[in-house]
């Protein structure tokens, strides 16, 4: 199952995913709504560590962990377990939104410092 075809997240994903994003880049392995493994193709520690950090700041997330199966393998596995009032897919989308907001803040702060 890909991120865009996941039943619980289809509507919210389509409003978040930019048109240029390859939805086949993320595969979801899940048997419960509150627990899932997301396999990202062509991603590494940069996204994995950032997502793990912001997910663990979310009080609705019980567990987050990522791994790179092998250095020559171009995949990153992210495991998320949430409390029952939010799905793992919703917490992933919130985490990606948080990273985007943090990046925007850093960019604006840096540019403002350059302008001074």
Curated annotation (Swiss-Prot):
Keyword Transcription: yes
Compartments where found: Nucleus
Keyword Transcription: yes
Keywords: DNA-directed RNA polymerase, Nucleus, Transcription
A GO biological-process term: transcription elongation by RNA polymerase I
A molecular function GO annotation: DNA binding
Predominant cellular place of this UniProt entry's protein: nucleus
Any Gene Ontology CC annotation: RNA polymerase III complex
Family to which this protein belongs: Belongs to the archaeal Rpo11/eukaryotic RPB11/RPC19 RNA polymerase subunit family.
Role, per record: DNA-dependent RNA polymerase catalyzes the transcription of DNA into RNA using the four ribonucleoside triphosphates as substrates. Common core component of RNA polymerases I and III which synthesize ribosomal RNA precursors and small RNAs, such as 5S rRNA and tRNAs, respectively.
Name of the molecule in the record: DNA-directed RNA polymerases I and III subunit rpc19
Organism of this sequence: Dictyostelium discoideum (Social amoeba)
Gene name per UniProt: rpc19
């Amino acid at each position: 199952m890909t991120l865009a075809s996941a039943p619980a997240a289809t509507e919210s994903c389509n409003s978040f995913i930019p048109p240029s994003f390859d939805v086949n880049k993320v595969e979801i392995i899940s048997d419960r709504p509150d627990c899932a493994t997301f396999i990202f193709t062509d991603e590494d520690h940069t996204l994995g560590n950032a997502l793990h950090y912001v997910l663990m700041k979310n009080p609705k997330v019980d567990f987050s962990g990522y791994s790179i199966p092998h250095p020559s393998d171009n995949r990153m596995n992210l495991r998320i377990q949430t409390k029952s009032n939010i799905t793992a897919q919703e917490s992933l989308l919130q985490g990606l939104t948080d990273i985007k907001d943090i990046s925007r803040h850093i960019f604006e702060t840096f540019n403002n410092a350059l302008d001074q």
